Amino acid sequence: MPFTLGQRWISDTESELGLGTVVAMDARTVTLLFPSTGENRLYARSDSPVTRVMFNPGDTITSHEGWQLHIDEVKEENGLLVYVGTRLDTEETNVTLREVLLDSKLVFSKPQDRLFAGQIDRMDRFALRYRARKFQSEQYRMPYSGLRGQRTNLIPHQLNIAHDVGRRHAPRVLLADEVGLGKTIEAGMILHQQLLSGAAERVLIIVPETLQHQWLVEMLRRFNLRFALFDDERYTEAQHDAYNPFETEQLVICSLDFARRNKQRLEHLCDAEWDLLVVDEAHHLVWSTDAPSREYMAIEQLAERVPGVLLLTATPEQLGMESHFARLRLLDPNRFHDFEQFVEEQKNYRPVADAVAMLLAGNKLSNDELNRLGDLIGEQDIEPLLQAANSDRDDAQAARDELVSMLMDRHGTSRVLFRNTRNGVKGFPKRELHTVKLPLPTQYQTAIKVSGIMGARKSAEDRARDMLYPEQIYQEFEGDTGTWWNFDPRVEWLMGYLTSHRSQKVLVICAKATTALQLEQVLREREGIRAAVFHEGMSIIERDRAAAWFAEEDTGAQVLLCSEIGSEGRNFQFASNLVMFDLPFNPDLLEQRIGRLDRIGQAHDIQIHVPYLEKTAQSVLVRWYHEGLDAFEHTCPTGRAIYDSAYASLINYLAAPEETDGFDDLIKSCREQHEALKAQLEQGRDRLLEINSNGGEKAQQLAQSIEEQDDDTNLIAFAMNLFDIVGINQDDRGDNLIVLTPSDHMLVPDFPGLPEDGCTITFERDVALSREDAQFITWEHPLIRNGLDLILSGDTGSSTISLLKNKALPVGTLLVELVYVVEAQAPKQLQLNRFLPPTPVRMLLDKNGNNLAAQVEFETFNRQLSAVNRHTGSKLVNAVQQDVHAILQLGETQIEQSARALIDNARREADEKLSGELSRLEALRAVNPNIRDDELAAIDSNRQQVLESLNQAGWRLDALRLIVVTHQ
């Protein structure tokens, strides 16, 4: 190689050293100094792994003093390059910059610069980069983005609500589905969409204290959203890092009590600039015109400051009209400001509901009915649609569906309230109760008597709680030596049941963690029964492992022993046998227990087994729940109301279970109250609201479409390719499970989203639902999204060289494969990627500028190529550098037409979609006051900003592959 003192070269193998300078040489060796690191390297002159750094007219370079030069001309003087051009900071022309004075920290970011500087990537990395660009662009344009990546069953009514609400600007809605229909999942889907699209970045979830961990687990396990749990300790700790502790995290969960009991803390919450507020159990916010509760006022303050609000609540019929109005008032105080007016409005929606029922019935409509429909919809050009709906034509059903949709839009609260009932949603199992009456052991009788004497001053409520758990009373007196499980007949019954049902999975729930732990030991030691334990003292990871062991079909645990609190938020639909070792204190907890199995998607009827001890509070409670509330075999929306009204009497019977006088009358009274309330709730059902909420056929199609996307084989191939190139170890464990672990030779030392000890993944939704320890990999999973970012945000795979063995072409024939990216820069919340995601445009040019890309498909072509080592590649580049420059210029002239076409299409699509949505809502605003002014203003502003950003869209070269034809 011809070396001269002062020349600048770059190492092919250690590009991180920066630019080197030739400082010494003899007949055989050359020494380079790399000023940016202060290191020297000695190379053999004949075959050194270095590449001469040479810039061309049009490039911009930096001097060692920091100023930049736009090159107009390149001269050579005594083997050294001199660059002549315009200095950018002073705009002085004909400035010279000798190569020896170039900045040594020079970074080559453009693909062509990296290629000419010898920074040549492996061929497989170039292919990965192109695929990443292609798939990322496709995924941005896919419908239902944000709905595909969650670890949930594809349940139509949930998807319908999430799809509708998740795409809105700052949604403010009430989610009021009946228990077991998945309000938490609906809220999570909405959050996932809003965060993924950039519509929201900061989210606050406020829940009752007992549900904090449930939400934390659900958001992480189902949606890969890592929330921070704020309590007193975390709040105090965060005060050291920021004036407002809540600004230290983007996603926060806290309890309602934590939020409201400290004035400064509430102010900090209000000042933290959240994008979305989620409030669970919002029906506990007590409100009246004269005296709203402190909890209600705290949420009201937040709702005034946060643009998007999701309230999760019991059904409106359970709440009562005034309480229901109070929730709507939080969402839109301008719209819902007068309770009396609201009551009147609700009455006026009956004709709309009747009209929808009429259309759904499918019968021919009379002229009066057609006229009434026309009046309700109130649009001038509605006549053809009415005629089509009332005809025998093929499009009659479509016309009826459209009329129903138009009526829905005009329905008073259909945009702010979503409510599904079990009657309106199919797919729930039956519940069958099996009670097992067992004798009260003498040991317990003695302990209860002594406890009664010693606890004479206890309140009736405390005595009632004690009487529910006689083993706890016994343990208090006997201490650690009290082996209650040796004589408690419930233990014998449980062992007998499990041994006679060895092939069935059984969930056992008891109130206390200690009970669960003691039962596990007994089952294991006495009968060798494989039992997993699940309680609040375990970490989330430990609970995951226990749940995964329980989920394993062949070698897994037969039984899972859960404590009351530990089981919150976990669902085990793959099991259908539930044993309640004891009973919870109120109907809500009873429903929560059954709800672990009684979920939509449960494939079998649920067998509920209740072994109870006679003459204890358990015997009282089992009768009251079953005979008084019918709470075991059916969901009980009336349970809390009746529990509150019968509380005093019930407590006395629980505290003194042997005194049964009048108990039958109490049960009868509660049952009558239950039937009356239930009939009242049924009569008050808003059928129109249910139709709107469950989505009908449209929701079914949505679920089916996402299910079809689940079968995308491109994802598996791409993910494996990505993991290989990044350097992540993959161990196939069978059953569609793969274990990923970091290796010692990864592309980056710490791959975001991959734990140090690795993780188990699956591409199958069904497997992910049954194995909580396995992460469900989709295009929306952080591992894939982080992998795409890792490849595309850097220069991995942006320049490479390949050989094409093809005897039909002359040896030395040169082809250049160019990948341009057409893109627009804009704030994430504009969601510009809906219209113009970063879009790759591939070109395959010969030296005459002929583009062969359409004739030569990428994957087919890529398989015909072979790799070149970096050293040989650098020599090839130097030999054909001038030809490559010429081809690049031809590429620049050709890309403009393709890019302009993409940008124009994106502009047209954005204008049509956003203008259409704005026009639709403006028209509806005249007949439905629930469409907010700020929502209309936001859509209009969004449209203008999107179109302006698309006007400024451009393109750039993202990757480059040089291909040389060989016959060997």
Swiss-Prot record:
InterPro entries, per database record: Helicase_ATP-bd, Helicase_C-like, Helicase_RapA, P-loop_NTPase, RapA_C, SNF2-like_sf, SNF2/RAD54-like_C, SNF2_N
GO process terms (BP): regulation of DNA-templated transcription
S-adenosyl-L-methionine listed as a keyword: no
The Helicase C-terminal domain extends over: 490-685
List the transmembrane segments: none
User: Disulfide connectivity?
Assistant: none
Residue ranges annotated as motif DEAH box = 280-283
Chain positions recorded as ATP binding sites: 177-184
Xref: SMART domains: DEXDc, HELICc
**Superkingdom of the source?**
Bacteria
Q: Which UniProt keywords apply?
A: Activator, ATP-binding, DNA-binding, Helicase, Hydrolase, Nucleotide-binding, Transcription, Transcription regulation
Function of the protein: Transcription regulator that activates transcription by stimulating RNA polymerase (RNAP) recycling in case of stress conditions such as supercoiled DNA or high salt concentrations. Probably acts by releasing the RNAP, when it is trapped or immobilized on tightly supercoiled DNA. Does not activate transcription on linear DNA. Probably not involved in DNA repair.
| PANTHER family (alphabetical) | DNA ANNEALING HELICASE AND ENDONUCLEASE ZRANB3 FAMILY MEMBER, SWI_SNF-RELATED MATRIX-ASSOCIATED ACTIN-DEPENDENT REGULATOR OF CHROMATIN SUBFAMILY A-LIKE PROTEIN 1
User: What quaternary arrangement does the UniProt entry report?
Assistant: Interacts with the RNAP. Has a higher affinity for the core RNAP than for the holoenzyme. Its ATPase activity is stimulated by binding to RNAP.
UniProt similarity note? Belongs to the SNF2/RAD54 helicase family. RapA subfamily.
Protein's recorded name: RNA polymerase-associated protein RapA
Native organism is Salmonella typhi
Name of the gene encoding the protein in the UniProt record: rapA
